[in-house]
Regions:
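A non-catalytic alpha/beta surface segment that caps or lines the substrate-entry region
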Residues: 44-122
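Second-shell loop/turn segments in exported
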Residues: 25-33, 47-59, 104-108, 139-149, ...
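Acidic/histidine-rich catalytic neighborhood of metal-dependent amide-processing enzymes
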Residues: 139-237, 245, 249, 253
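Active-site-adjacent substrate-binding region
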Residues: 213-315
Length: 315
C-alpha cells in the first residue's frame, strides 16, 4: 500500500458523533500527581548526550531509563537488534505491510546495533489484553534531542511511574524505541516480532513524539490516515481536553498501523514545521506545564478506559 502522509499543521477538529456524556465521566487520575521536577530531571538525563542509535550516548540513556523503570517495579528487557539498510521505498512507499515490516528488505549486512526497552508491569496478566504506551529515545547524530524526543521519553517515563501499580481490565505495556530516526527501525523490529496471537491481544497504542515545545501550538492527536480509529475515539471520549485530529505516520505510529494495530500519535501541532535549531539543545524551550497536562489527559483516558466501551465503539 502507498501512504500519503500529512504534516502536523494540517489538523481538524475531532468529531466522533457519539453521545454528549463526556461531562459525566469521573476523572480518577486527578488523585495522581504528575511531578514536573521529575519531568525536567528525566529530560536532562536522557538528553545529556547525542543518542543516535548504537552510540555510547544512547546506551547511557537506555541504562538510565532501565534503572528508573526497575526502580518503579517493572521487569525490563532490552530488545537488541541489528539495523539494516532502509530508505523511503521500504518505509513510506512500501507496497505491502510485509515489505514495511521486513527489517532487512535489501538483504544487506548490518550497519549497526540498537536496543529497544520493553517494560512489563509486576502484575502483568497474560490473560488480559494490553494497551501500549510508546516513545522513541534516540536522537539524530547532530543534536542531543531535547525536543525530539527526550520530551516524549520523559513523558512516557513519568506515565510509567504513576501507572506502575495500575491493575484493572487490561495491562499497560511500556516501550522505548531506538532507531526511530533511521526509518523507524526500532518500532518496526518490535511490531514485526509480534506473532498473531500477541497482536490480537493488543488494544492499541499511544505514541508520544515531540511534545511541550514552546511556540509550536497545542498537543494534537494523529492517525496515519487522518481519520478516526478506535484509539482516537476512546481518547476523545475519556479526556477532559479536546484534541485536534491530523494525519500522521511520520513517527513510530506508522509501524503499528502497518502491523494493523490501532494507534494514535501525540505531538505539538507544528512539531515538524521547522528545521532543527538551537531549541533542540535548550531545556528552556520546553513548556513543562503542557507536558504535565498531557500526562493528566492520558491518565484520564487510561483510568476510565473500559473494555465494554471499547468493544461498543469497535463495532
Amino acid at each position: 500500500m502507498i501512504l500519503l502522509l500529512t504534516g502536523c499543521s494540517e489538523s481538524k477538529k475531532l468529531s466522533t458523533n457519539q453521545s454528549e456524556d463526556n461531562n459525566q465521566i469521573k476523572y480518577k487520575s486527578k488523585d495522581i500527581t504528575i511531578n514536573e521536577n521529575l519531568l525536567k530531571e528525566n529530560i536532562k538525563k536522557i538528553s545529556s548526550n547525542v543518542r543516535n542509535y548504537g552510540s555510547d550516548g544512547e546506551i547511557e540513556s537506555s541504562e538510565y531509563i532501565n534503572n528508573q523503570l526497575t526502580k518503579y517495579g517493572y521487569s525490563v528487557m532490552f530488545q537488541e537488534f541489528d539495523v539494516y539498510k532502509q530508505d523511503q521505498y521500504t518505509t513510506v512507499q512500501s507496497e505491502t505491510n510485509l515489505d514495511y515490516l521486513n527489517n532487512n528488505f535489501y538483504n544487506s549486512d548490518s550497519i549497526g546495533k540498537a536496543r529497544n526497552i520493553i517494560a512489563t508491569q509486576r502484575n502483568f496478566d497474560k490473560n488480559k489484553k494490553t494497551l501500549y504506551l510508546t516513545a522513541h529515545y534516540d536522537s539524530t547524530s547532530d543534536t542531543i534531542g531535547i525536543v525530539d524526543n527526550a520530551s516524549g521519553s520523559a513523558t512516557l517515563l513519568e506515565l510509567a511511574r504513576v501507572l506502575s501499580d495500575y491493575n484493572d481490565e487490561f495491562n499497560i505495556g511500556i516501550v522505548f524505541f531506538s532507531a526511530e530516526e533511521y526509518f523507524r527501525s526500532g518500532s518496526r523490529k518490535f511490531v514485526s516480532s509480534l506473532d498473531e496471537d500477541e497482536k490480537n491481544n493488543i488494544l492499541g497504542c499511544i505514541n508520544i513524539d515531540m511534545v511541550g515545545e514552546k511556540g509550536k501550538g497545542p498537543i494534537i492527536m494523529q492517525t496515519v490516515n487522518g481519520e478516526n480509529n478506535i484509539m482516537s475515539i476512546m481518547m476523545d471520549k475519556l479526556t477532559n481536553k479536546e484534541f485536534n485530529l491530523s494525519g500522521g505516520g511520520s513517527s513510530d505510529d506508522l509501524s503499528f498501523y502497518m502491523g494493523e494495530i490501532p494507534v494514535i500519535n501525540l505531538c505539538n501541532d507544528y512539531a515538524k514545521a521547522r528545521l532543527y535549531d538551537d531549541a533542540e539543545d535548550n531545556i528552556e524551550s520546553i513548556d513543562f506545564n503542557q507536558i504535565k497536562e498531557l500526562c493528566e489527559s492520558i491518565l484520564n483516558a487510561i483510568t476510565d478506559f473500559k473494555l465494554s466501551m471499547y468493544n461498543k465503539f469497535l463495532k
